[in-house]
Every structure is written in structure tokens, then in C-alpha cells.
């Protein structure tokens, strides 16, 4: 069985997987991601944000449910409190002149907050900046910390491995339900995802 261990809910670094087969990105794969042919999500594309020189072109904050047993529901949150945390981070970005893109997760019960840079910057600088935004965002809404914040991509400061994979947005099947979509301040999917 050559199915990705992550699809079987097994935690494993991609570079350590005996089944890894790095494949070239093709137009067919991009179309499959955007259309969503496969119910099991095996046509979903992801990206390693950490570049070989230790830089990155974007930063992603992942907000989801990391309670015990959450993997059974694809880490979907069970209430809407996570939206307050995402909104706090969004506000901190906007106060500092940054226009983040917020993506509702595939399940519709979590989010990715994307910040793109004009040029590659050291991952350590991006991550320190991200932690500062989280700290300021938490204090702006009187939180001791973000409960639903799970991790930041890239997850490493330096390129000693390929890093962690982040699923790309606009996944065809999820998008049909308004998920895996970029959303506005009212949590509505933008009508034209290509014109944001």
C-alpha cells in the first residue's frame, strides 16, 4: 500500500517516508487540486515554505483544534471561539499595515492566515515577526495566549531539512462548500478567489 502515511493519520516527516516519490508539478496536478477529483484528498497539493537557503516567501498561521481526539474530525474546532483569535491576528496585521489573507480550512472549522513577502526573507526573521504579531494580537483581545493557534509555517528557523508541508488553498472539493477559500472580514468567501 503506497498511500501517504499522513492520509492514514500516521505522523511522519515526508523526507523519512519509504514511499516518497518527489514528483514534478504539472498542469494536470494543479487542475486536479483546483477541481478536486478525489474524495480522499489525495489530489490536494501542498508546499514546503522553507527554501534551501533558509528563507521563505510567506508565513502561515494555522488555527485549529488540537484537543485530544481532534484528528478524528480533521482537527475541526467545536465552537467559534477560534474565529475571535483569527480576527485578533488579522487586526494586528492591519494595524501594522499588513494585508493578510485568511483562508477558511478544508473542514470549515479552522483557518490559515497567510502573509506574503515581496521577496524571500530569512525564516528566522519571518518567524520572530510572526511571534511578535501573536503576542500583540493576544494582548489586544485580552488573551494570555492563543488557544487555537497550532503552528506557524515555516516551522523551522533554518534549513536543516525540507521543513513542514502546508496544504495549499482552493482545494476543489472543499471549495464547493465555501471551504479552503479566502474569506473577508465577515467570514464570507470572496466571490472571485482569483481577484483578491
Question: What annotation goes with each model-predicted range?
Answer:
Residues 44-83, 118-196:
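DNA replication initiation modules
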Residues 1-109, 116-132:
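Signature for HUH/AEP ssDNA processing cores
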Amino acid at each position: 500500500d503506497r498511500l501517504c502515511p499522513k492520509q492514514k493519520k500516521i505522523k511522519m516527516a515526508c523526507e523519512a517516508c519509504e514511499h516518497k516519490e518527489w514528483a514534478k508539478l504539472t498542469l494536470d496536478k494543479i487542475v486536479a487540486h483546483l477541481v478536486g477529483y478525489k474524495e480522499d484528498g489525495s489530489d490536494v497539493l501542498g508546499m514546503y515554505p522553507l527554501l534551501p537557503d533558509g528563507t521563505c516567501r510567506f508565513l502561515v498561521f494555522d488555527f485549529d483544534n488540537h484537543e485530544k481526539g481532534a484528528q478524528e474530525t480533521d482537527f475541526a474546532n467545536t465552537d467559534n471561539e477560534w474565529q475571535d483569535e483569527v480576527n485578533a491576528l488579522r487586526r494586528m496585521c492591519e494595524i501594522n499595515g499588513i494585508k493578510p489573507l485568511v483562508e477558511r480550512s478544508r473542514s470549515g472549522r479552522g483557518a490559515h492566515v497567510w502573509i506574503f513577502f515581496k521577496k524571500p526573507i530569512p525564516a528566522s526573521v519571518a518567524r520572530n515577526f510572526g511571534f511578535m504579531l501573536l503576542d500583540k494580537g493576544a494582548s489586544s483581545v485580552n488573551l494570555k495566549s492563543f488557544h487555537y493557534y497550532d503552528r506557524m509555517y515555516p516551522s523551522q528557523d533554518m534549513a536543516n531539512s525540507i521543513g513542514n508541508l502546508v496544504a495549499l488553498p482552493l482545494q476543489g472539493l472543499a471549495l464547493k462548500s465555501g471551504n479552503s477559500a479566502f474569506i473577508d472580514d465577515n467570514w464570507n468567501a470572496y466571490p472571485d478567489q482569483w481577484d483578491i
